[in-house]
Amino acid sequence: MVEPLLSGIVLGLIPITLAGLFVTAYLQYRRGDQLDF
C-alpha cells in the first residue's frame, strides 16, 4: 500500500516542480533584462 501512495506523491510533485522551475526561470529572465545581471 506504500508504493501507490509514493508514486501518487511523485506524480503530483513533478508538475508542480516543473511549473516552479519555469516560473523562477522566467522571473529571473525578466529581472535580468531589467537589472542587467
Swiss-Prot record:
GO terms, molecular function: electron transporter, transferring electrons within cytochrome b6/f complex of photosystem II activity
Disulfide bond sites: none
UniProt key word Oxidoreductase: no
GO cellular component: chloroplast thylakoid membrane; cytochrome b6f complex
A Pfam cross-reference name: PetG
Membrane topology: Single-pass membrane protein
Assigned keywords, A-Z: Chloroplast, Electron transport, Membrane, Photosynthesis, Plastid, Thylakoid, Transmembrane, Transmembrane helix, Transport
Cellular compartment(s): Plastid, Chloroplast thylakoid membrane
Gene Ontology process terms (BP): cytochrome complex assembly; photosynthesis
InterPro entries: Cyt_6/f_cplx_su5, Cyt_6/f_cplx_su5_sf
Record keyword Hydrolase present: no
TM annotation in the entry: 5-25
Assembly and oligomerization: The 4 large subunits of the cytochrome b6-f complex are cytochrome b6, subunit IV (17 kDa polypeptide, PetD), cytochrome f and the Rieske protein, while the 4 small subunits are PetG, PetL, PetM and PetN. The complex functions as a dimer.
Function of the protein: Component of the cytochrome b6-f complex, which mediates electron transfer between photosystem II (PSII) and photosystem I (PSI), cyclic electron flow around PSI, and state transitions. PetG is required for either the stability or assembly of the cytochrome b6-f complex.
Family: Belongs to the PetG family.
Name listed for the protein in its UniProt record: Cytochrome b6-f complex subunit 5
